[in-house]
Curated annotation (Swiss-Prot):
This is Large ribosomal subunit protein uL30. GO terms for biological process: translation. The gene is rpmD. Part of the 50S ribosomal subunit. Belongs to the universal ribosomal protein uL30 family. It comes from Geobacter sulfurreducens (strain ATCC 51573 / DSM 12127 / PCA). The lineage of its organism: Bacteria, Pseudomonadati, Thermodesulfobacteriota, Desulfuromonadia, Geobacterales.
Length: 59
């Protein structure tokens, strides 16, 4: 496992639940095509799994 994850928001948050929007805000993803680099921790991986249909992840 690599030490960092590169996470990109590929779908809009419009029409999602409030919990999914909270997860996206927690990841720092506010706009489509925004990319963040975060540490590969179990907490981050769990958040990514909650919104896996909306993001693209590269290790």
């Amino acid at each position: 496992m690599s030490a960092e994850l590169k996470i990109t928001l590929v779908r809009s948050h419009i029409g999602t639940t409030s919990k999914q929007r909270a997860v996206l805000n927690g990841l720092g993803l506010t706009k489509v095509n925004k990319t963040v680099v975060l540490k590969n921790t179990p907490e981050i991986v769990g958040m990514v799994q909650k919104v896996a249909h909306m993001v693209k992840v590269v290790e």
